[in-house]
A protein has these predicted regions:
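Membrane-integral, polyisoprenol-dependent glycosyltransferases
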Residues: 1-298, 303-485, 492-496, 561, ...
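Structural recognition of the beta-strand scaffold that forms the well-ordered cores
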Residues: 123, 175, 215, 280, ...
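Alpha-helical scaffolding within the catalytic cores
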Residues: 265, 273, 661-671
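Membrane-interface segments at or immediately adjacent to transmembrane helices
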Residues: 280-284, 307, 316, 326, ...
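Short helix-loop-beta junction
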Residues: 558, 643-654
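Aromatic/acidic, Gly/Pro-rich catalytic loop(s) in extracytoplasmic/lumenal soluble domains
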Residues: 566, 613-625, 635-643, 647-648, ...
Length: 739
């Protein structure tokens, strides 16, 4: 017969407030509360300090994310732009995402000024809070050892260490989901409606940060409550319905606002062809990722995924590793005019490759806003059940896969006869459901444009691994067949770590040998303990600790590599350690590559070149009563002026270049009414090659401008060569009487 394994989550009563108080306790925050081991609070504080160091180490050179940084700048200088989440200071168009994640960044920039560090600061704070809250959640579920272990594992997940150090939406999403899990667990333990409703609120706020990705945790939270909440079924269902309504209301608040407010009083919704927030959220950023078109949504491009394998505009497929095609005239993309391709020569040289005469340092480093590593060519190749186990994602998130999955399978099997209200089973359902649902959805997606998406897998992986280590260690000491689970898990981790390390054999090559040696020693000691029935001896205990440490040493080293800017990822995409985009041996591009020319790290992209300053001074001095100082035929051409001045520059075409804003009629009305005088045509259209033609609304506007407006010679504003704008940018002056 197998021995009975003790519940790793004993139901210790909550100490009373009077019992937990100590003289001067408020001033001794480093001391553990009553009922916890003396080492618990110091260990937690040490973990939080490590997290803060990892996340904030490169904060001054963290860089900006193209396109989305324009929205942050605009929202920091205009209250209307902040309310609606506009991409430009004039609040004419939104980004192609719900702007909830940009609000903390914009408020920070408004308070401290617009710098790379001020935009990144909210993510650093969110990351440290995630560590503290995850510790609390797992401690309630599986005890203090598991709580500290989960916090440490989460801190040292490579993609997490990079993500919270940059201004990415995924940081806000992960923060909201961890807070939702905390509230859901409290509801699961005491069946209080308030806690469950708060969980729904946090998921709704997560929806504001990253839309439908936040809803992927709902099945896990709801199932865990149904399985383990200690109340009758009718009440459980009622609580879930109430919390679901609240979650839906918070989630759709921005969509409802944009639907109710008249179109003339709010920005146009990017990502849609009919100014529909619903189409942008549920089509462009939702079903389009699975190849399902929603009427009114723009077909997915680099931002939404390249599931269809075509270049915007229906031309040939993307070239691997970058956009290919000609440079972007009139823009200041780094290197040769295209986004750097995950470690290309131009990127490594600080973005100073040949091409546009005004090519300039590019803070942030490693890819464009549409895809890591330079473009959709670098994205995964479509739906695949092996996607999360391959070289792009697994080294960033998947080091703990074997241990976490074994914990889920064995834990559910061992607790299958537990009654309703079982805390252990409830936690397994919550975290296991989260892991499985998110993993399945990611595998089924047509493409995943950013590695940072994987960060939502980090909390369940850390929680399951930490709780599993405690559960399996107790099973090992108790004896019986279940006692073999721990050595099997450690052995599986050793094999898996060796496999993942093989993707990058030149990166810290000694690590895989250290991992193998530690895990082998641990497994040998555990087998010896089983054979001799001395599972509690010091030798066996040391072997267990060595095996567990060996299983996590490699991801810890990868995460620590973010202290070197060359391995810290970028504001475009998260990723610690060597890049997975360069054939398995590529070295990551420095996140502060742009600092090599003319300015300090991440702030470099907020400064206009000398030629851009001359052009801006020219149009500003002649703006008169016009509302817009300048219009451009793409966000890329508008971006330098928005970031540097915060002035009312009108970008046309949206992120993809195919959004019909403004329409030709609206554009001519702006000129006719004297609200727009100058237009800069770059010919590129949006941020993509192939958008510079005459098709579409922006193409027709471009044709009209060339036919009805006067080209301004560059010498008139002090620039003697059109190379200042990539050889293709032309400034036009439009007179109202000619509109």
């Amino acid at each position: 017969m197998s021995a009975t394994v003790a519940d790793p989550c004993p139901r210790a009563g909550r100490p009373s407030r009077s019992a937990s108080r100590r003289p001067g306790a408020a001033w001794r925050f480093w001391r553990s509360p009553a009922g916890q081991p003396p080492w618990a609070r110091p260990a937690l504080l040490a973990t939080a300090v490590v997290a803060a160091v990892l996340y904030a180490w490169n904060i001054t050179s963290s860089g900006f994310a193209l396109y989305y940084s324009d929205a942050v700048k605009s929202m920091s200088v205009s209250w209307k732009a902040l309310l609606f989440g506009a991409m430009d200071p004039g609040a004419t168009i939104t980004p192609d995402k719900i702007p909830g994640s940009f609000v903390p960044q914009a408020l920070s920039a408004r308070l401290f000024g617009f710098h790379a560090w001020s935009v990144t600061l909210p993510q650093c704070v969110e990351g440290v809070i995630c560590v503290l809250v995850l510790h609390r959640v797992v401690r309630r579920w599986a005890g203090p050892v598991a709580g500290i272990t989960a916090a440490a594992l989460f801190t040292c997940t490579p993609v997490v260490a990079s993500m919270f150090g940059h201004s990415m939406e995924d940081g806000g999403l992960t923060f909201c989901l961890v807070m939702a899990a905390d509230c859901a667990q409290r509801a699961l333990l005491d069946a209080r409606l308030r806690s469950l409703v708060l969980s729904g609120v946090w998921v709704g706020l997560g929806f504001q940060a990253k839309m439908l990705q936040a809803w992927m945790v709902l099945p896990a939270l709801a199932t865990a409550y149904l399985v383990a909440a200690p109340v009758r079924l009718r009440r459980r269902v009622g609580h879930l319905l109430v919390a679901g309504v609240v979650c839906l209301a918070v989630s759709l608040s921005w969509v409802v606002m944009m639907t109710v407010v008249p179109a003339k009083d709010r920005p146009y919704v990017d990502g849609s062809t009919d100014n529909s927030a619903f189409a942008m959220v549920f089509g462009y950023n939702g079903l389009e990722r699975f190849g399902i078109h929603v009427p009114g949504s723009v077909a997915s491009t680099g931002s939404g995924g390249a599931a269809r394998g075509t270049r915007p505009g229906g031309t040939a497929s993307w070239r691997a590793g970058g956009f290919g095609g000609a440079p972007f005239p009139g823009t200041r993309a780094p290197g040769n005019g295209v986004f750097p391709a995950g470690g290309g020569k131009a990127a490594r040289n600080g973005g100073t490759g040949e091409g546009t005469g005004s090519a300039r340092p590019f803070a942030g480093g490693r890819g464009g806003p549409g895809a890591p590593g330079g473009g959709p060519g670098g994205m995964d190749a479509g739906p695949s059940w092996l996607k999360l186990f391959q070289s792009r994602f697994a080294p960033q998130i998947g080091w703990l896969y074997p241990f976490a999955l074994l914990t889920l399978v064995l834990g559910v099997w061992w607790r299958r006869r537990a009654g309703r209200g079982d805390r252990t089973l409830g936690g397994l359902v919550l975290w296991g459901g989260w892991l499985v649902v998110v993993g399945v959805v990611f595998s089924a997606m047509g493409s995943i444009p950013h590695t940072a998406y994987m960060a939502t897998l980090a909390p369940p992986l850390a929680a399951l691994t930490a709780a599993g280590a405690v559960l399996m260690r107790r099973a090992y000491r108790a004896g019986g067949p279940r006692g073999w689970a721990l050595p099997v898990a450690v052995a599986a981790e050793a094999v898996w770590s060796w496999y993942l390390s093989s993707f990058h054999p030149d990166f810290l090559p000694w690590l895989k040998w250290l991992t193998a040696a530690a895990c082998l020693a641990g497994v040998a000691a555990m087998v010896l303990g089983r054979v001799t029935r001395r599972t509690r001896s010091r030798l066996v205990t040391a072997g267990v600790l060595a095996g567990l440490a060996g299983a996590v040493v490699t991801p810890v080293a990868w995460s620590a590599s973010v202290l070197d800017p060359a391995y810290a990822g970028s504001a475009f995409d998260a990723g610690a350690g060597p890049s997975a985009m360069g054939g398995g041996r590529a070295r990551a591009v420095p996140g502060a590559a742009g600092a090599s020319r003319g300015g300090p790290g991440g702030d470099i992209t907020t400064r206009l070149t000398a030629d851009e300053r001359k052009l801006y001074a020219y149009v500003k001095s002649r703006q008169g009563g016009a509302r817009y100082v300048l219009a451009t035929d793409g966000w890329n051409a508008a971006s330098p002026y928005i970031l540097a001045t915060g002035d009312t520059v009108l970008p046309m075409g949206g992120f993809s270049g195919s959004v019909p804003h403004p329409s030709p009629g609206d554009f001519t009305a702006l000129v006719r009414g004297g609200r727009l005088r100058f237009v800069l045509l770059s010919g590129s259209g949006g941020g993509f090659p192939g958008r510079g033609g005459t098709a579409g609304a922006t193409g027709r506007v471009r044709t009209w401008v060339r036919a009805h407006c006067a080209a301004v010679p560059s010498a008139r504003y002090g620039v003697t060569t059109t190379q200042a704008f990539g050889g293709g940018g032309t400034l036009y002056e439009c007179a109202p009487e000619r509109a």
